């Protein structure tokens, strides 16, 4: 591309100004002196190549290129441009420099330490290099995700992180204009902060979930304010303080005019008042709907019709607000792959103090994703949201499994009338074919394959329907959701008034999914090496020697890939080649045994202990005989949010001695 002379001279002038501003010449002189002093022998001459290497090593060239990109970007932005898409990234532990768009407004949020985390009052100072429990702070604001560096758990955790949050309007015409104070005052999205604790074994715990109202900074002098945030516990401890964070908020570029604190407070009070009124009206309507539902049949009182559910902070919210069409971008390609992703997120019931029934806790999506595990309702809500994003008519079903255990799963309704159940905890799919209990069976009816027994209601982001059929048994239910004699609907307008995006300020916004940060090859290799060591030590304790056969280990890879492919697509492929290769690798008169197993965590020691509980696997690991050769292969398959499926296969071959 050639430039006219006037443009070329203008560009040279811009570059020269930028280099002078950065004092590049001074920095080059310093590095030149340092290189001659420290790296060159007395009789050696410094070449241009050596100097460029030294500049590149110290990051000078990268800094210059970034700054020059910044300048050219600003030149290009003089032309009209379409609104920029929101950025989503997961902040890594290493700090990275960010190019700031001078046409946008930013909120710089700094976390300047914590205090009063009394649960860790007696926590000793970790020794250098010692593995210890850590705190990680996760943030979400308007489609942007951030994660702090992990800090050791302590009474006063050493949080020192800064997060640059872009503040903008998404409506047409406003996307390219810098937001002023009045515009920002109308942006009611809070900053969702989630605190996660990770123990020395890699197990995560949700410590706190907090919605930060940031707009007080708009009424502060110079657009800068400091505040203390008291974090409360979750679930049964939602009224107990877990600690305090010191936070500083700063607008960038600085505001030309700040609003009065009275205007800010009035706006916030008005929003709270509107939200409270909408929620009150919905509650009145829900009570009326429930009375009508009970009048159909008094036995409906015992059905699992869930209109409201408590989140991690103990706040009652309509169940429809936990679901929303969610697009995974390029991270997941198919609905079945989405089901596999949800399946490999860990399953853990909400912790409860003491005995009794199940503790209810439907987590907000950010809390579920950051903790990387949750209850069946969390899995079902996420899977339903993803399936809605793929354009399917999906609903969360609330009912029971065997022995009357409450459960949630997902249902999709096809255009051809097919009803499919999706089990979010396993990724399995079941076609539902209702049986008519009034007709005498010509032949014995086959037992349904799905584990569900009863169903009380179904819902998504727009609809809520209570089951009003004579029986709530799943096998006899007809899923014609338009038939009001079988399914009593709630008003879609009433649901929209409290569950539509932006309907109320108390509605947590949905975060985007983040790509995995796990290197599958490196992690697979690490776990495999750890398992080899554990097997060798275990056999040594039994007085057995261990001989590994690398080729046999390698031959196990296709089987593991085939197992994961089958979980993702429900199609079995590649097994014939694996069996043929094993037959060739095992000589006549020898026996081959293999044991595949699947985990959703990366703790090798924990996986090994689980494997030893299987008699068949123990038989392989503790194999005795002539010419015993052992093999182990690990294959980690990564999914968004650093979730992963870990396949392990232990195998042995030995000469059969009668």
Curated annotation (Swiss-Prot):
Coiled coil: none annotated. It is found in: Cytoplasm, Cytoskeleton, Microtubule organizing center, Centrosome; Cytoplasm, Cytoskeleton, Microtubule organizing center, Centrosome, Centriole. The modification Phosphoserine is found at residues 74, 82. It comes from the Eukaryota. Pfam families: CEP76-C2, CEP76_C, CEP76_N, CEPT76_peptidase. GO terms for cellular component: centriole; centrosome; cytoplasm. One of its GO terms (biological process) is regulation of centriole replication. Keywords: Cytoplasm, Cytoskeleton, Phosphoprotein. Belongs to the CEP76 family. PANTHER family: CENTROSOMAL PROTEIN OF 76 KDA. Interacts with CCP110 and CEP97. Centrosomal protein involved in regulation of centriole duplication. Required to limit centriole duplication to once per cell cycle by preventing centriole reduplication. This is Centrosomal protein of 76 kDa. It comes from Pongo abelii (Sumatran orangutan).
């Amino acid at each position: 591309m050639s430039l006219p002379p006037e443009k070329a001279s203008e560009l040279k002038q811009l570059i020269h100004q930028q280099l002078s501003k950065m004092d590049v010449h001074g920095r080059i002189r310093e590095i030149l002196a340092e290189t001659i002093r420290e790296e060159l022998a007395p009789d050696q001459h410094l070449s241009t190549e050596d100097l460029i290497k030294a500049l590149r090593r110290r990051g000078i060239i990268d800094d210059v290129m970034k700054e020059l990109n910044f300048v050219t970007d600003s030149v290009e932005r003089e032309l009209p441009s379409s609104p920029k898409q929101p950025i989503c990234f997961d902040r890594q532990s290493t700090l990275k420099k960010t190019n700031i768009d001078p046409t946008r407004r930013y909120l710089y949020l700094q976390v300047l330490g914590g205090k009063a985390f009394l649960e860790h009052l007696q926590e000793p100072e970790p020794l250098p290099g010692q593995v210890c429990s850590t705190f990680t702070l996760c943030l979400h604001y308007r489609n942007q995700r951030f994660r702090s560096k992990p800090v050791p758990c302590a009474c006063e955790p050493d949080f020192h992180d800064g997060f640059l949050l872009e503040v903008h309007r998404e409506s047409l015409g406003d996307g390219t204009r810098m937001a002023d104070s009045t515009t920002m005052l109308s942006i009611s999205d809070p900053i969702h902060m989630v605190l996660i604790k990770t123990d020395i074994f890699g197990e995560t715990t949700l410590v706190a979930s907090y919605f930060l109202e940031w707009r007080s900074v708009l009424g502060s002098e110079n657009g800068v304010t400091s505040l203390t945030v008291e974090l409360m516990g979750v679930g049964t401890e939602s009224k107990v303080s877990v600690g305090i964070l010191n936070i500083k908020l700063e607008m960038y570029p600085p505001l030309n005019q700040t609003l009065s604190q009275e205007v800010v407070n009035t706006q916030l009070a008005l929003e709270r008042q509107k939200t409270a009124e909408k929620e009150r009206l919905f509650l009145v309507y829900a009570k009326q709907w429930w009375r009508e539902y009970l009048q159909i049949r008094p036995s409906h009182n015992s059905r699992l019709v869930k209109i409201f559910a408590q989140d991690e902070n103990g706040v009652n919210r309509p169940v429809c607000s936990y679901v929303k069409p969610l697009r995974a971008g390029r991270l997941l390609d198919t609905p079945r792959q989405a089901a596999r992703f949800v399946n490999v997120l860990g399953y853990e019931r909400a912790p409860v103090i003491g005995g009794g029934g199940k503790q209810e806790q439907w987590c907000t999506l950010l809390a579920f994703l950051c903790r990387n595990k949750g209850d069946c309702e969390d899995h079902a809500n996420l899977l339903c949201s993803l399936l809605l994003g793929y354009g399917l008519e999906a609903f969360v079903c609330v009912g029971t499994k065997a022995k009357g255990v409450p459960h949630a799963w997902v249902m999709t309704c096809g255009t051809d009338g097919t009803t499919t159940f999706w089990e979010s905890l396993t990724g399995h799919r079941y076609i539902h074919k209702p049986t008519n209990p009034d007709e005498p069976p010509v032949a014995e009816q086959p037992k349904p394959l799905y584990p569900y027994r009863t169903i009380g209601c179904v819902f998504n982001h727009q609809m809520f329907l209570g089951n009003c059929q004579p029986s709530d048994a799943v096998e006899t239910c007809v899923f014609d959701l338009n038939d009001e004699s079988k399914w009593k609907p709630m008003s879609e307008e009433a649901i929209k008034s409290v569950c539509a995006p932006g309907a109320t300020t108390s509605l947590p916004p949905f975060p985007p999914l983040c790509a995995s940060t796990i290197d599958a090859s490196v992690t697979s290799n690490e776990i495999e090496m750890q398992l080899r060591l554990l097997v060798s030590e275990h056999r040594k304790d039994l007085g057995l020697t261990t001989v590994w056969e690398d080729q046999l280990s390698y031959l196990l890879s296709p089987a593991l890939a085939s197992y994961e492919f089958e979980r993702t697509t429900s199609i079995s492929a590649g097994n014939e080649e694996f069996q043929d290769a094993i037959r060739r690798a095992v000589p006549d008169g020898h026996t081959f045994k293999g044991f595949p197993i699947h985990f959703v965590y990366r703790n090798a020691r924990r996986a090994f202990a689980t494997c030893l509980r299987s008699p068949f696997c123990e038989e392989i690991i503790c194999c005795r005989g002539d010419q015993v050769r052992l093999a182990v292969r690990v294959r980690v398959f990564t999914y968004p949010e650093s979730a992963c499926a870990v396949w392990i296969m232990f195998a042995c071959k030995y000469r059969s001695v009668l």
